[in-house]
């Protein structure tokens, strides 16, 4: 059971723009131009290709033992938000690219029926690029149009309007863009004077614009020729930016939609916490089925799941407490998600994510933290004054001294 969110509030965070400012959830269907190239046959069904491979190196050590797409925000895996957005866009056939964490992804998503979709799993032995994912999904995709969605991306408002626009106009490719302060960390688009996509670069050292590619792409079957025609990049990967550039060079119809609202790549802890904050602002408050004693104080937008127990504690929302978790003599501050089966006693925590089965006992203050599954956080002995740590590879720790 995952928390309900106020979709109207999410949709109101910000509109999108397709070479201009428009709201994707309210785009009116457009009449397709009659003089399309041969590839523009009548629009049929549309599929989705969701990428859930990737090593998640920026979320280590959490991703040493868990798929990055399954790290929860507001107690729901990031991947699930994407699958829900795809289903809301009317797409029911979904292929999921999986890598080393395939078993975990399969266990979480199943056959897709909980989302109203039918899932086909497509193994990718090595992370050889987004275009490689399209290449190996050829049998699943057939000649159908499709949306490619990166499983660790979060987009407020979903993609229904974007899909509707694409199905009406049917360009060969349509990409999502957003303005970012550090475009060198992303694929970057350069637009011409008329706002058309002129060129793309993958993580350029000297970006020619601040328009980064968001992890959602829409294609007709023409893209299959493109991914077969490109060579691996210096990274040894088949880049989707190179495939789209091939389409541009072949004078195919490539369009862009610029996001004016909220988008995050949840590939690092900072962005994960920021997305958690955004989603928590939409969670519907509820304490139904929870055991909250009279000594506890619940303030603001707080959701406490059934079976959770809160005693002698103060919880200030927006926050969520998972099922069967125990909060005793503790302070849980704003923008905190505590998963199921956790225990927080005689401690303070704020602006953090606590994963399933973790416990925090007797700790003065925890902030801006991501606590993994079944982690135990306790204070060190007062004397001698020392920090006792057991840290996994690539851990990052800030210690107050």
Write out the residue ranges for each language-model feature.
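Intrinsic-disorder-associated, low-complexity terminal segments enriched in Asp/Asn/His/Tyr and depleted
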Residues: 2, 6-11, 19, 23, ...
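Left-handed beta-helix
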Residues: 26, 32, 196, 221-222, ...
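Short internal beta-strands
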Residues: 95-99, 176-177, 353, 370
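Active-site glycine-centered loops adjacent to acidic/histidine catalytic or metal-binding residues
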Residues: 54, 152, 179, 268
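Conserved core of the sugar-phosphate nucleotidyltransferase
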Residues: 155-234
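Short, conserved catalytic or adaptor-binding loops enriched in Gly and charged residues
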Residues: 111-116, 191, 247-248
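A structural signal for short hydrophobic beta-strand segments in well-ordered beta-sheet cores
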Residues: 70, 189-191, 256
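Conserved N-terminal catalytic core of the sugar/cofactor nucleotidyltransferase
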Residues: 2, 27, 32-50, 58-61, ...
């Amino acid at each position: 059971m995952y928390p309900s969110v106020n979709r109207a509030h999410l949709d109101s965070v910000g509109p999108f723009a397709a070479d201009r400012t428009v709201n994707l959830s309210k785009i009116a269907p457009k009449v397709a131009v009659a003089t399309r190239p041969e590839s523009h046959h009548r629009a049929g069904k549309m599929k989705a290709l969701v990428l859930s491979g990737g090593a998640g190196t920026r979320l280590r050590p959490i991703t040493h033992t868990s798929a990055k797409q399954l790290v929860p925000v507001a107690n729901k895996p990031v991947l699930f938000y994407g699958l829900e957005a795809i289903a809301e866009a009317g797409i029911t056939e979904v292929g999921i690219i999986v890598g080393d964490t395939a078993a975990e992804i399969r266990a979480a998503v199943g056959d897709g029926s909980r989302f109203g979709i039918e899932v086909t799993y497509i193994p990718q032995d090595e992370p050889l690029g987004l275009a490689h994912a399209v290449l190996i999904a050829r049998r699943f995709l057939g000649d159908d149009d499709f949306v490619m969605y990166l499983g660790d991306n979060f987009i407020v408002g979903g993609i229904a309007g974007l899909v509707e626009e694409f199905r009406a106009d049917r360009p060969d490719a349509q990409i999502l863009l957003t303005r970012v302060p550090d475009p060198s960390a992303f694929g970057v688009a350069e637009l011409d004077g008329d706002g058309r996509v002129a060129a793309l670069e993958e993580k350029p050292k000297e970006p020619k614009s601040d328009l980064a590619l968001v992890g959602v792409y829409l294609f007709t079957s023409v893209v299959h020729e493109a991914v077969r025609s490109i060579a691996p990049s210096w990274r040894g990967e088949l880049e989707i930016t190179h495939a789209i550039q091939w389409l541009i060079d072949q004078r195919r119809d490539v369009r862009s939609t610029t996001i004016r609202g909220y988008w995050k790549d949840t590939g690092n802890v900072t962005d994960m916490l920021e997305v958690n904050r955004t989603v928590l602002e939409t969670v519907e408050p509820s304490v139904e089925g929870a055991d909250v004693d009279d000594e506890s104080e619940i303030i603001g937008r707080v959701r406490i799941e059934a079976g959770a127990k809160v005693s002698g504690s103060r919880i200030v929302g927006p926050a969520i407490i998972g099922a069967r978790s125990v909060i005793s003599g503790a302070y849980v501050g704003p923008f905190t998600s505590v998963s199921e089966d956790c225990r927080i006693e005689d401690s303070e925590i704020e602006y953090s994510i606590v994963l399933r089965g973790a416990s925090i006992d007797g700790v003065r203050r925890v902030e801006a933290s991501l606590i993994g599954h079944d982690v135990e956080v306790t204070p060190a002995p007062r004397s001698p004054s020392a920090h006792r740590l057991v840290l996994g590879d690539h851990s990052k720790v800030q210690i107050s001294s």
